[in-house]
């Protein structure tokens, strides 16, 4: 007899309102309560609060719940600065006082290291910048609303593809925020507005950059309107008709300064969004490395040379390794433009075996890593085998930092300093820096 597949029925969710006590924050900034010894994650709730919740997801190991109301509020709660806060998917901690965000992130960093059995050494003061007007980069989503024939212009809603219409963003630098209203008006006047993909705004040290992604060519009138708009406001304009095609239409080539070094970039390239914190981060990393003129330094995940180029001004040689070849080529050009002949850049996938690479058998006295959220598991064995005196690890994910730290410690390194970087105020994102010494 044929057997027919019967899908399992989805477990029903208990939607009855329930009162819980919030005890702490998770690493993304959600409140955690416990019901029948199982953690319940509640977006928008703070430790010390009594919350009325409604379950939206119940699994064997954990549950998620919606915050209905607060029966008891934390004294650390504040009114969010942004009118779009409860819809927009950008910030998720504006309801917590900024100084308490720092405390919570510091505690989370230490907790994750302890959980992995990593002895943390000295906990240094966090690197901080402005609480607001700190983001020098924004990606603005666009969608033609067929009912109104107007563009939805703003940021994605939380856990949704829908767009929150935004004309002011308090965490954007003022130089970019001031253009949102007029840019919305301009784009809505274009005949080809239905062919728009998204817009990116980037603040360089030599001007504001506007990138427009479009899926069909602009007619002559639309293109001239864009150029006129940028000329009136002295904006650097790029058009992107395809994902891998970038046309520089007007303005200078953008750059930012770090430690007196000009780093040129395109709006496709990764740069740190927080200028102030980035400058302090580079300064601290160079200080922790305790550099001298005879040092040879390996910079892994080097990007455009954010660390490599300032390093090259202080040591004998620097080798930078980056996975994206376009950024490697720009890093080389940046070195030439800054007349730095003692730095070399190579392309390599640092998630794969690298022991056969030429640089992997070179003697380095110091190593710096700045990997993406996935961490540097693929290259940590090589780092340890190179036996540098010092390793500085800059991390945007404390969980992978804690994991990768274990391997260095197994090879005789000690974690001597650890510090948090407040790169993204009002969000759950946690950047950190760790110093390992042999």
UniProtKB/Swiss-Prot annotation:
Active site (record annotation): 396
EC number, as in UniProt: 2.1.1.190
Catalyzed chemical reaction(s): uridine(1939) in 23S rRNA + S-adenosyl-L-methionine = 5-methyluridine(1939) in 23S rRNA + S-adenosyl-L-homocysteine + H(+)
InterPro entries on file: 23S_rRNA_MeTrfase_RlmD, MeTrfase_TrmA_AS, MeTrfase_TrmA_CS, NA-bd_OB-fold, SAM-dependent_MTases_sf, TRAM_dom, U5_MeTrfase_fam
Pfam short name (any one): tRNA_U5-meth_tr
Residues annotated for [4Fe-4S] cluster binding in this entry: 82, 88, 91, 169
Ranges of residues in domain TRAM: 10-69
Binding site for S-adenosyl-L-methionine: 272, 301, 306, 322, 349, 370
Record key words, sorted: 4Fe-4S, Iron, Iron-sulfur, Metal-binding, Methyltransferase, rRNA processing, S-adenosyl-L-methionine, Transferase
GO biological process, one term: rRNA base methylation
Functional description taken from the UniProt entry: Catalyzes the formation of 5-methyl-uridine at position 1939 (m5U1939) in 23S rRNA.
PANTHER family reported for this sequence: 23S RRNA (URACIL(1939)-C(5))-METHYLTRANSFERASE RLMD, RNA M5U METHYLTRANSFERASE
Full protein name: 23S rRNA (uracil(1939)-C(5))-methyltransferase RlmD
Encoding gene per record: rlmD
């Amino acid at each position: 007899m044929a057997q027919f597949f019967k899908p399992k029925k989805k477990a029903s969710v208990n939607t009855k309102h329930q009162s819980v006590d919030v005890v702490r924050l998770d690493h993304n900034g959600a409140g955690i309560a416990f019901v029948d010894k199982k953690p319940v994650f509640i977006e928008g709730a703070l430790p010390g609060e009594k919350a009325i919740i409604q379950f939206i997801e119940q699994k064997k190991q954990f549950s998620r719940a919606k915050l209905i109301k607060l029966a008891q509020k934390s004294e650390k709660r504040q009114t969010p600065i942004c009118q779009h806060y409860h819809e927009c998917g950008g910030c998720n901690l504006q309801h917590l006082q900024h100084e308490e965000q720092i405390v919570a992130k510091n505690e989370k960093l230490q907790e994750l290291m302890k959980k992995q059995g990593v002895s943390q050494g000295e906990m240094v003061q966090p690197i901080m910048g402005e609480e607001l007007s700190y983001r020098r980069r924004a990606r603005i989503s666009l969608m033609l609303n067929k009912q109104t024939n107007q563009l939805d212009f703003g940021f994605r809603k939380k856990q949704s593809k829908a767009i929150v219409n935004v004309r002011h963003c308090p965490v954007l630098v003022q130089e970019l925020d001031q253009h949102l209203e007029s840019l919305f008006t301009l784009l809505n006047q274009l005949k080809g507005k239905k062919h728009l993909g998204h817009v990116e705004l980037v603040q360089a040290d030599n001007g504001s950059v506007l990138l427009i992604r479009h899926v069909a060519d602009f007619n002559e009138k639309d293109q001239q309107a864009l150029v006129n708009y940028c000329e009136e406001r002295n904006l650097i304009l790029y058009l992107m008709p395809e994902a891998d095609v970038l046309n520089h239409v007007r303005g200078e080539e953008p750059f930012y300064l770090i430690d007196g070094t000009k780093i040129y970039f395109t709006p496709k390239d990764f740069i740190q969004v927080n200028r102030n914190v980035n400058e302090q981060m580079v300064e601290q990393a160079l200080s922790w490395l305790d550099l001298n003129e005879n040092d040879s330094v390996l910079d892994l995940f080097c990007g455009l040379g954010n660390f490599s180029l300032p390093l090259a001004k202080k040591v004998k040689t620097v080798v930078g390794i980056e996975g994206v070849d376009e950024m490697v080529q720009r890093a080389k050009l940046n070195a030439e433009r800054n007349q730095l002949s003692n730095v070399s850049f190579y392309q390599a996938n640092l998630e794969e075996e690298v022991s056969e690479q030429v640089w992997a058998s070179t003697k380095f006295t110091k190593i710096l890593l700045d990997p993406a959220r996935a961490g540097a598991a693929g290259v940590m064995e090589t780092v340890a085998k190179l036996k540098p005196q010092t390793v500085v690890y800059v991390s945007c994910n404390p969980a992978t930092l804690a994991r990768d730290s274990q391997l260095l410690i197994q090879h005789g390194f000690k974690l001597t300093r650890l510090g948090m970087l407040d790169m993204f105020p009002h969000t759950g994102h946690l950047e950190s820096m760790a110093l390992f010494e042999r």
